[in-house]
């Protein structure tokens, strides 16, 4: 029996060694699983942090984009208002300019009518002056002829100078022009 005890001992030792090997194997597998789980947890935390950072970044970018869009829309709105005001100002200036032009056209037409009437008046005055000048010339010739024919002997000895006669003719013309 000692052989069988020894076989039983061997067998129990073998089983104990196998159990110990299995325990160590399970322990190493448990350690590997624990380290794998720890690594997965750390990686999950990194992923969660990255996802959180990405989420925050996305929300920040969305906020910035929405702010930029709002600012751009406000600037466009202000620009449109300025353009509208500019157009209104331009339209009022054009209206004033058109009004000024129509006023100037009316004044120009009035000036043309006045000029036409003045031209007619001037033409009438010129024709009247021509008639008056012809009459005066005729009267002067008559006077000159009568004065020459009725000269006395004393006057004939002292002939008049040309300048005195010219002065008299100019004086008569001057008086005729002023309607004296």
Curated annotation (Swiss-Prot):
GO biological process terms held by the UniProt record: reciprocal meiotic recombination
One GO term describing the cellular component: nucleus
Key words, A-Z: Chromosome, Meiosis, Nucleus
Main localization, broad class: nucleus
Species for this entry: Schizosaccharomyces pombe (strain 972 / ATCC 24843)
Protein name, UniProt field: Meiotic recombination protein rec15
Function: Required during the early stages of meiosis for meiotic recombination.
Knockout or disruption consequences: Abolishes localization of hop1 to DNA double-strand break (DSB) hotspots.
Subunit structure: Homomer. Interacts (via C-terminus) with hop1 (via C-terminus); the interaction is direct. Interacts (via C-terminus) with rec10; the interaction is direct. Interacts with mde2; the interaction is direct.
UniProt subcellular location: Nucleus; Chromosome
């Amino acid at each position: 029996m000692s052989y069988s005890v020894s076989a039983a001992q061997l067998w129990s030792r073998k089983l104990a060694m196998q159990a110990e090997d299995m325990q160590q194997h399970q322990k190493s597998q448990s350690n590997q699983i624990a380290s794998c789980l720890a690594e997965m947890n750390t990686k999950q935390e990194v992923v969660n942090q990255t996802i959180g950072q990405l989420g925050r970044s996305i929300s920040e970018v969305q906020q910035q984009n929405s702010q930029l869009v709002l600012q751009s829309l406000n600037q466009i709105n202000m620009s449109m208002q300025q353009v509208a005001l500019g157009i209104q100002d331009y339209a009022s200036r054009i209206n004033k300019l058109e009004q000024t032009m129509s006023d100037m056209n009316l004044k120009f037409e009035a000036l043309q009518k006045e000029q036409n009437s003045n031209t007619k008046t001037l033409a009438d005055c010129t024709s009247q002056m021509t008639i008056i000048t012809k009459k005066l010339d005729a009267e002067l010739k008559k006077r000159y002829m009568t004065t020459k024919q009725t000269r006395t002997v004393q006057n004939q000895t002292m002939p008049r100078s040309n300048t005195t006669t010219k002065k008299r003719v100019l004086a008569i013309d001057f008086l005729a022009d002023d309607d004296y």
